[in-house]
Amino acid sequence: MNLQVEVGGLKLKNPVMTASGTFGFGREYGEYIDLNQLGAIVVKGLTVNPKEGNPPPRVYETPCGMLNSVGLQNPGINAFIEKELPFLRDYDVAVIVNIAGETIEEFAYMAKKLDIDGVDGIEINVSCPNVKKGGMAFGINPEDIFNITKEVKKVTQKTVIVKLTPNVGDIGVCAKAAEDGGADAVSLINTIAGMAINIDTRTPVFKNVIAGLSGPAIKPIALRMVYEAARAVKIPVIGMGGISSFKDALEFMIAGAKAVAIGTCNFVNPNCTIEVIEGIKQYMVLNNIEDINEIIGSLKVD
């Protein structure tokens, strides 16, 4: 049985990845699961300088999901390279680093700095909807997506993935802009812009008012967008958004995703990624499927 997939030149032992921002730097989950079993670890978003993030509250539970407004809290790229990357190098798993810049120059600077041993890929975060400055403005403009991708590709030999925001009119146009800029793959979707209100105080739950919705509630939207993106580009698509079971993962792959990323479910069930991998294996056995690639893009549409 072959579970191996290739995403933009990156060979993964299986198609199951972690979604940035839900798995820390891998260390946090290392005591719960065997990290070597994962297809790839996508670490939480990094910025040039350390970032404290947004004031609390940062997380708010909703029916079938959650809103978050973390604000890209992270130690900065230098601290990651010095303190976190050595830990990840000890594992036999692809490491993809998510970067969030406030200017095109910052994206290029970080990508160049990460062109080092132990980093297998770079995910350009143009889509985080809970930060007042940075990503959001880039992610809604296809021209900006193209320009950032082009500049990042100039300075790195690593696999470059562009993470797209769902808060746009035509996801296919944005995916094509990333492809035209030289992206090796696109990943989608990031969180959907949402909000919550405290009816007693009549104030927003979050200081930033707008937050990012994730979890099972967004899965049908994510699935539709992955389907549209896969039809719009020739480069691989990584699907995510509300995946909490192997059945969810298979839906995304049948729709055209070459790999999938699991996010919010990690908070509820730290073993979710492993369960999805095992579930896919069982599905393949039951359906006499020898190669996972037979499933990808196999949707039958009349």
Swiss-Prot record:
Question: One MF term in GO for this entry?
Answer: dihydroorotate dehydrogenase (NAD+) activity
Query: What is one Pfam family matched by this protein?
Result: DHO_dh
Cofactor annotation remark:
Binds 1 FMN per subunit.
Primary subcellular site in the record, as a coarse category:
cytoplasm
Say which enzyme class the record assigns.
Answer: oxidoreductase
GO cellular component terms, A-Z: cytoplasm
> What cofactor does its activity depend on?
FMN
Subcellular locations according to the entry: Cytoplasm
UniProt keyword list:
Cytoplasm, Flavoprotein, FMN, NAD, Oxidoreductase, Pyrimidine biosynthesis
Q: Output the PROSITE patterns linked to this UniProt entry.
A: DHODEHASE_1, DHODEHASE_2
What Gene3D superfamilies does its record include? Answer: Aldolase class I (3.20.20.70)
Residue sites binding FMN per the record? 20, 44-45, 98, 125, 163, 189, 215, 241-242, 263-264
Q: Which InterPro entries match?
A: Aldolase_TIM, DHO_dehydrogenase, DHOD_1B, Dihydroorotate_DH_1, Dihydroorotate_DH_1_2, Dihydroorotate_DH_cat, Dihydroorotate_DH_CS, Dihydroorotate_DH_I
Q: What is its EC number?
A: 1.3.1.14
Q: Where is the active site?
A: 128 (nucleophile)
State the pathway, as annotated in the record. Answer: Pyrimidine metabolism; UMP biosynthesis via de novo pathway; orotate from (S)-dihydroorotate (NAD(+) route): step 1/1
NCBIfam families for this protein: PRK07259.1 (NF005574), pyrD_sub1_fam (TIGR01037)
Q: What does it do? A: Catalyzes the conversion of dihydroorotate to orotate with NAD(+) as electron acceptor.
Q: How does it assemble?
A: Heterotetramer of 2 PyrK and 2 PyrD type B subunits.
Protein name from the UniProt record:
Dihydroorotate dehydrogenase B (NAD(+)), catalytic subunit
What's the encoding gene here? pyrD
